[in-house]
Curated annotation (Swiss-Prot):
EC numbers, comma separated: 3.4.21.88
Function: Represses a number of genes involved in the response to DNA damage (SOS response), including recA and lexA. In the presence of single-stranded DNA, RecA interacts with LexA causing an autocatalytic cleavage which disrupts the DNA-binding part of LexA, leading to derepression of the SOS regulon and eventually DNA repair.
Matches recorded under Gene3D superfamilies: Umud Fragment, subunit A, Winged helix-like DNA-binding domain superfamily/Winged helix DNA-binding domain
Protein name: LexA repressor
Organism of origin: Chromohalobacter salexigens (strain ATCC BAA-138 / DSM 3043 / CIP 106854 / NCIMB 13768 / 1H11)
Catalytic residues (positions): 126, 163
Family under the similarity heading: Belongs to the peptidase S24 family.
DNA-binding region residue numbers: 29-49
Site entry: Cleavage: 91-92
Reaction(s) this enzyme catalyzes, per UniProt: Hydrolysis of Ala-|-Gly bond in repressor LexA
Record bears the keyword rRNA-binding: no
Residue spans crossing the bilayer: none
Amino acid sequence: MSRSLTSRQQHVFDFIVKTMNELGYPPTRAEIARALGFRSPNAAEEHLRALDRKGVIRMIPGTSRGIRLTGEEDAAATSTDGLPVVGEVAAGSPILAAAHIDRHCPLAPDYFTPRADYLLRVRGLSMKDAGILDGDLLAVHRTQQIRDGQIVVARLDDEVTVKRFKRQGHHVWLVAENADFAPIEVDLRHQDLEIEGLGVGVIRGGGGNGLH
Protein backbone atom coordinates (compact mmCIF):
# COMPACT_ATOMS: atom_id res chain seq x y z
CA MET A 1 0.00 0.00 0.00
CA SER A 2 1.27 3.45 -0.88
CA ARG A 3 1.31 5.73 2.13
CA SER A 4 2.45 9.34 2.51
CA LEU A 5 3.05 9.48 6.24
CA THR A 6 4.97 12.15 8.07
CA SER A 7 7.95 11.04 10.11
CA ARG A 8 5.97 11.31 13.35
CA GLN A 9 2.99 9.43 11.90
CA GLN A 10 5.35 6.66 10.75
CA HIS A 11 6.77 6.40 14.28
CA VAL A 12 3.25 6.09 15.71
CA PHE A 13 2.30 3.48 13.12
CA ASP A 14 5.48 1.46 13.70
CA PHE A 15 4.85 1.50 17.47
CA ILE A 16 1.30 0.22 16.94
CA VAL A 17 2.53 -2.67 14.76
CA LYS A 18 5.34 -3.48 17.22
CA THR A 19 2.94 -3.53 20.17
CA MET A 20 0.44 -5.75 18.36
CA ASN A 21 3.19 -8.17 17.35
CA GLU A 22 4.61 -8.37 20.88
CA LEU A 23 1.44 -8.27 22.98
CA GLY A 24 -1.35 -9.34 20.65
CA TYR A 25 -3.36 -6.14 21.16
CA PRO A 26 -2.96 -2.45 20.25
CA PRO A 27 -1.59 0.24 22.59
CA THR A 28 -3.69 2.87 24.36
CA ARG A 29 -3.33 6.58 23.60
CA ALA A 30 -1.51 7.02 26.91
CA GLU A 31 0.94 4.23 26.05
CA ILE A 32 1.66 5.79 22.65
CA ALA A 33 2.21 9.20 24.24
CA ARG A 34 4.54 7.77 26.88
CA ALA A 35 6.57 5.69 24.43
CA LEU A 36 7.01 8.46 21.86
CA GLY A 37 7.43 11.40 24.22
CA PHE A 38 4.17 13.23 23.54
CA ARG A 39 3.00 15.68 26.17
CA SER A 40 -0.45 14.13 26.46
CA PRO A 41 -2.64 11.35 25.05
CA ASN A 42 -4.45 14.04 23.03
CA ALA A 43 -1.36 14.42 20.84
CA ALA A 44 -1.40 10.68 20.18
CA GLU A 45 -5.10 10.94 19.34
CA GLU A 46 -4.38 13.55 16.65
CA HIS A 47 -1.83 11.29 14.97
CA LEU A 48 -4.19 8.31 15.17
CA ARG A 49 -6.92 10.32 13.46
CA ALA A 50 -4.46 11.26 10.71
CA LEU A 51 -3.52 7.59 10.24
CA ASP A 52 -7.20 6.71 10.11
CA ARG A 53 -7.82 9.33 7.42
CA LYS A 54 -4.93 7.93 5.38
CA GLY A 55 -6.41 4.45 5.61
CA VAL A 56 -3.58 2.61 7.37
CA ILE A 57 -5.53 2.06 10.60
CA ARG A 58 -9.18 2.00 11.56
CA MET A 59 -10.26 3.57 14.84
CA ILE A 60 -12.99 1.83 16.85
CA PRO A 61 -14.90 4.33 19.04
CA GLY A 62 -15.69 3.66 22.68
CA THR A 63 -12.60 1.73 23.75
CA SER A 64 -9.09 2.79 24.73
CA ARG A 65 -7.52 0.07 22.56
CA GLY A 66 -9.82 0.61 19.60
CA ILE A 67 -7.16 0.53 16.88
CA ARG A 68 -7.21 -1.91 13.97
CA LEU A 69 -4.73 -2.29 11.14
CA THR A 70 -6.05 -2.44 7.59
CA GLY A 71 -5.13 -4.40 4.50
CA GLU A 72 -1.47 -5.22 4.01
CA GLU A 73 -0.51 -3.80 7.39
CA ASP A 74 -2.78 -6.29 9.16
CA ALA A 75 -1.17 -9.17 7.29
CA ALA A 76 2.29 -7.82 8.05
CA ALA A 77 1.52 -7.82 11.77
CA THR A 78 0.82 -11.57 11.69
CA SER A 79 3.92 -13.71 12.02
CA THR A 80 4.74 -16.04 9.14
CA ASP A 81 5.79 -18.58 11.77
CA GLY A 82 2.17 -19.19 12.80
CA LEU A 83 0.08 -17.91 15.68
CA PRO A 84 1.94 -16.26 18.56
CA VAL A 85 1.46 -17.68 22.05
CA VAL A 86 1.01 -14.63 24.25
CA GLY A 87 1.59 -14.86 27.99
CA GLU A 88 -0.89 -16.55 30.26
CA VAL A 89 -4.56 -16.03 31.07
CA ALA A 90 -6.06 -16.92 34.43
CA ALA A 91 -8.97 -19.32 34.21
CA GLY A 92 -9.42 -19.10 37.96
CA SER A 93 -8.79 -15.83 39.74
CA PRO A 94 -7.22 -13.21 37.44
CA ILE A 95 -3.45 -12.94 37.28
CA LEU A 96 -1.25 -10.26 35.72
CA ALA A 97 -0.89 -10.98 32.03
CA ALA A 98 2.62 -11.79 30.80
CA ALA A 99 3.45 -9.28 28.09
CA HIS A 100 5.64 -11.43 25.85
CA ILE A 101 5.35 -14.05 23.16
CA ASP A 102 6.51 -17.44 24.40
CA ARG A 103 6.69 -19.11 20.99
CA HIS A 104 4.66 -19.63 17.82
CA CYS A 105 2.33 -22.49 16.95
CA PRO A 106 2.48 -23.69 13.31
CA LEU A 107 -1.21 -23.08 12.72
CA ALA A 108 -2.88 -20.77 10.18
CA PRO A 109 -5.13 -18.03 11.61
CA ASP A 110 -7.93 -19.11 9.25
CA TYR A 111 -8.06 -22.54 10.91
CA PHE A 112 -10.53 -20.86 13.29
CA THR A 113 -13.75 -18.97 12.50
CA PRO A 114 -13.55 -16.05 12.91
CA ARG A 115 -9.80 -16.07 12.30
CA ALA A 116 -7.53 -16.20 15.34
CA ASP A 117 -5.01 -13.43 15.98
CA TYR A 118 -3.08 -15.11 18.79
CA LEU A 119 -3.14 -17.90 21.36
CA LEU A 120 -3.35 -17.38 25.11
CA ARG A 121 -2.21 -19.97 27.62
CA VAL A 122 -4.87 -20.89 30.20
CA ARG A 123 -4.12 -21.50 33.86
CA GLY A 124 -6.72 -22.95 36.23
CA LEU A 125 -10.01 -24.80 35.96
CA SER A 126 -12.69 -22.11 36.20
CA MET A 127 -13.74 -22.77 32.56
CA LYS A 128 -13.49 -26.57 32.63
CA ASP A 129 -17.20 -27.15 31.96
CA ALA A 130 -16.77 -25.24 28.68
CA GLY A 131 -13.93 -27.57 27.73
CA ILE A 132 -11.16 -25.06 28.50
CA LEU A 133 -8.66 -26.76 30.77
CA ASP A 134 -5.47 -25.90 32.63
CA GLY A 135 -2.57 -25.71 30.16
CA ASP A 136 -4.72 -25.32 27.05
CA LEU A 137 -4.13 -22.66 24.43
CA LEU A 138 -7.17 -20.49 23.76
CA ALA A 139 -7.41 -19.12 20.23
CA VAL A 140 -8.45 -15.47 20.37
CA HIS A 141 -9.96 -13.20 17.72
CA ARG A 142 -9.23 -9.54 18.48
CA THR A 143 -12.55 -7.70 18.70
CA GLN A 144 -14.67 -5.62 21.04
CA GLN A 145 -17.85 -6.67 19.21
CA ILE A 146 -19.27 -9.36 21.47
CA ARG A 147 -22.65 -10.70 22.53
CA ASP A 148 -24.03 -11.93 25.82
CA GLY A 149 -23.07 -15.53 26.49
CA GLN A 150 -19.86 -15.53 24.48
CA ILE A 151 -16.51 -16.54 25.99
CA VAL A 152 -14.20 -13.55 26.07
CA VAL A 153 -10.73 -12.52 27.12
CA ALA A 154 -11.29 -9.59 29.48
CA ARG A 155 -8.82 -7.19 31.06
CA LEU A 156 -9.96 -5.93 34.46
CA ASP A 157 -7.71 -3.59 36.46
CA ASP A 158 -4.66 -4.58 34.35
CA GLU A 159 -5.30 -8.28 34.87
CA VAL A 160 -6.59 -10.75 32.31
CA THR A 161 -9.13 -13.53 32.63
CA VAL A 162 -11.20 -15.84 30.41
CA LYS A 163 -14.89 -15.92 31.27
CA ARG A 164 -18.38 -15.98 29.78
CA PHE A 165 -19.68 -12.44 29.24
CA LYS A 166 -23.06 -11.22 30.48
CA ARG A 167 -24.20 -7.60 30.64
CA GLN A 168 -27.19 -5.71 31.98
CA GLY A 169 -27.03 -1.92 31.85
CA HIS A 170 -23.91 -0.65 33.61
CA HIS A 171 -23.18 -4.07 35.11
CA VAL A 172 -21.17 -6.90 33.58
CA TRP A 173 -20.75 -10.39 34.99
CA LEU A 174 -17.72 -12.46 34.03
CA VAL A 175 -19.07 -15.94 34.65
CA ALA A 176 -17.01 -19.07 35.21
CA GLU A 177 -17.94 -22.47 33.79
CA ASN A 178 -17.25 -24.19 37.10
CA ALA A 179 -19.62 -24.14 40.08
CA ASP A 180 -16.68 -23.66 42.46
CA PHE A 181 -16.04 -20.13 41.13
CA ALA A 182 -18.32 -17.16 41.79
CA PRO A 183 -19.05 -14.70 38.97
CA ILE A 184 -16.95 -11.53 38.86
CA GLU A 185 -19.28 -8.53 38.95
CA VAL A 186 -18.08 -5.32 37.30
CA ASP A 187 -19.69 -1.88 37.62
CA LEU A 188 -18.69 -0.09 34.42
CA ARG A 189 -19.28 3.30 36.06
CA HIS A 190 -16.43 2.71 38.50
CA GLN A 191 -14.21 -0.03 37.04
CA ASP A 192 -12.17 -0.21 33.85
CA LEU A 193 -13.09 -3.30 31.85
CA GLU A 194 -11.67 -3.93 28.39
CA ILE A 195 -12.52 -6.79 26.08
CA GLU A 196 -9.31 -8.04 24.50
CA GLY A 197 -10.94 -10.59 22.25
CA LEU A 198 -13.32 -13.46 21.64
CA GLY A 199 -12.46 -17.10 22.31
CA VAL A 200 -12.80 -18.98 19.01
CA GLY A 201 -11.20 -22.35 19.74
CA VAL A 202 -9.00 -24.43 22.02
CA ILE A 203 -5.77 -26.33 21.47
CA ARG A 204 -5.70 -29.08 24.07
CA GLY A 205 -2.58 -29.36 26.22
CA GLY A 206 -0.66 -26.67 24.37
CA GLY A 207 2.28 -26.65 26.75
CA GLY A 208 4.61 -28.68 24.54
CA ASN A 209 6.53 -27.75 21.43
CA GLY A 210 3.85 -29.05 19.10
CA LEU A 211 0.08 -29.22 18.94
CA HIS A 212 -1.83 -31.96 20.71
